[in-house]
Amino acid sequence: MGQKINPLSFRLGINKLHHSSWFARPQSYTAILQEDKKIRDYIFTNLLRASISRIQINRQFNQVELQLHTSRPGVIIGRSGTGIDSLKRNVKNLLSKQSQLKINIIDVTNPDIDAVLLACFISQQLESRTTFKRAVRQAIQRAQKSDIPGIKIQVSGRLNGAEIARTEWIREGRVPLQTLKADLDYATSSAYTSFGVVGVKVWIFKG
């Protein structure tokens, strides 16, 4: 089971938390859920250069708090805070009128061991026509500088423009997928190359 299931959802309530934290009445649940999706879609689409790894949405009554985990906070804040003001205005338009919005930016101090950012890095390398083995090796070397116990990276598709799609993976160290108390970070990404879409999966064991 641990080999197939998403490692993050498998560990919810043990050492992982939901990315949205709120309660709602049944009649308003779907509307709030759709708001959350609109917020995430807007931020990930319009702040591609900001290297955002996680968006945490907390709600309490009409208070909405966004926590943006990013390795490049300056891109979001902008010059003299113009970027964050613009973001606040645009996100507020996606919320109901009575909602009060607060945005907190949390700096990701070590992006090399963040699965989302590492998967995005590999995708960017593949899109710029770097060979998949070189892209994966570069990502592993960056992660290993932080002395993590293990990392696994898998890429699937028409690798290096091959006629037949295949799956390749490389693992360094231990990645215990079935140990529930293991602190595993996991992310997926897609690289849109001229030969087709290449899927990227990253598992990082942090201890």
From Swiss-Prot:
Q: Which residues form the signal peptide?
A: none
Q: Which CDD domains match?
A: KH-II_30S_S3 (cd02412)
Question: Could you state one GO cellular component term attached to this entry?
Answer: cytosolic small ribosomal subunit
The UniProt record lists the KH type-2 domain at 39-109
One annotated GO molecular function is:
rRNA binding
Q: Name one Pfam family in it.
A: KH_2
The protein's matches in PROSITE patterns, at most eight in alphabetical order, are given as: KH_TYPE_2 (PS50823), RIBOSOMAL_S3 (PS00548)
Q: Does the keyword Nucleotide-binding apply?
A: no
GO process terms (BP): translation
Q: Where in the cell is it found?
A: Plastid, Chloroplast
Q: Quaternary arrangement and interactors, per the entry?
A: Part of the 30S ribosomal subunit.
Protein family (similarity comment): Belongs to the universal ribosomal protein uS3 family.
What protein name is recorded for this chain?
Small ribosomal subunit protein uS3c
